[in-house]
Amino acid sequence: MTIDRTFPIFTVRWLAVHGLAVPTVSFLGSISAMQFIQR
Protein backbone atom coordinates (compact mmCIF):
# COMPACT_ATOMS: atom_id res chain seq x y z
CA MET A 1 0.00 0.00 0.00
CA THR A 2 2.82 2.39 0.85
CA ILE A 3 4.64 1.68 -2.42
CA ASP A 4 1.45 2.29 -4.43
CA ARG A 5 0.94 5.58 -2.62
CA THR A 6 4.47 6.96 -3.03
CA PHE A 7 4.99 5.72 -6.59
CA PRO A 8 2.50 8.15 -8.23
CA ILE A 9 4.11 11.05 -6.34
CA PHE A 10 7.53 10.01 -7.65
CA THR A 11 6.09 9.68 -11.16
CA VAL A 12 4.45 13.12 -11.05
CA ARG A 13 7.66 14.64 -9.72
CA TRP A 14 9.69 12.85 -12.43
CA LEU A 15 7.31 14.08 -15.15
CA ALA A 16 7.37 17.61 -13.74
CA VAL A 17 11.17 17.71 -13.60
CA HIS A 18 11.57 16.36 -17.14
CA GLY A 19 8.69 18.51 -18.38
CA LEU A 20 10.59 21.58 -17.21
CA ALA A 21 14.13 20.39 -17.90
CA VAL A 22 13.66 19.20 -21.50
CA PRO A 23 12.28 22.52 -22.89
CA THR A 24 14.91 24.46 -20.90
CA VAL A 25 17.78 22.39 -22.30
CA SER A 26 16.42 22.63 -25.86
CA PHE A 27 15.87 26.39 -25.42
CA LEU A 28 19.41 26.97 -24.15
CA GLY A 29 20.76 24.70 -26.88
CA SER A 30 18.93 26.66 -29.59
CA ILE A 31 20.22 29.97 -28.19
CA SER A 32 23.81 28.72 -28.06
CA ALA A 33 23.42 27.31 -31.60
CA MET A 34 22.10 30.64 -32.90
CA GLN A 35 24.97 32.56 -31.29
CA PHE A 36 27.45 30.04 -32.70
CA ILE A 37 25.94 30.39 -36.20
CA GLN A 38 26.02 34.20 -36.01
CA ARG A 39 29.76 34.07 -35.33
UniProtKB/Swiss-Prot annotation:
Belongs to the PsbE/PsbF family. GO terms for molecular function: electron transfer activity; heme binding; iron ion binding. Its main location: plastid. Heterodimer of an alpha subunit and a beta subunit. PSII is composed of 1 copy each of membrane proteins PsbA, PsbB, PsbC, PsbD, PsbE, PsbF, PsbH, PsbI, PsbJ, PsbK, PsbL, PsbM, PsbT, PsbX, PsbY, PsbZ, Psb30/Ycf12, at least 3 peripheral proteins of the oxygen-evolving complex and a large number of cofactors. It forms dimeric complexes. Its cofactor is heme b. Heme binds at H18. Coiled coil: none annotated. Keywords: Chloroplast, Electron transport, Heme, Iron, Membrane, Metal-binding, Photosynthesis, Photosystem II, Plastid, Thylakoid, Transmembrane, Transmembrane helix, Transport. One of its GO terms (biological process) is photosynthetic electron transport chain. InterPro entries: PSII_cyt_b559_bsu, PSII_cyt_b559_CS, PSII_cyt_b559_N. It comes from the Eukaryota. It is found in: Plastid, Chloroplast thylakoid membrane. This b-type cytochrome is tightly associated with the reaction center of photosystem II (PSII). PSII is a light-driven water:plastoquinone oxidoreductase that uses light energy to abstract electrons from H(2)O, generating O(2) and a proton gradient subsequently used for ATP formation. It consists of a core antenna complex that captures photons, and an electron transfer chain that converts photonic excitation into a charge separation. The chain crosses the membrane at residues 14-30. Pfam families: Cytochrom_B559. One of its GO terms (cellular component) is chloroplast thylakoid membrane. It is a single-pass membrane protein. This is Cytochrome b559 subunit beta. With its partner (PsbE) binds heme. PSII binds additional chlorophylls, carotenoids and specific lipids.
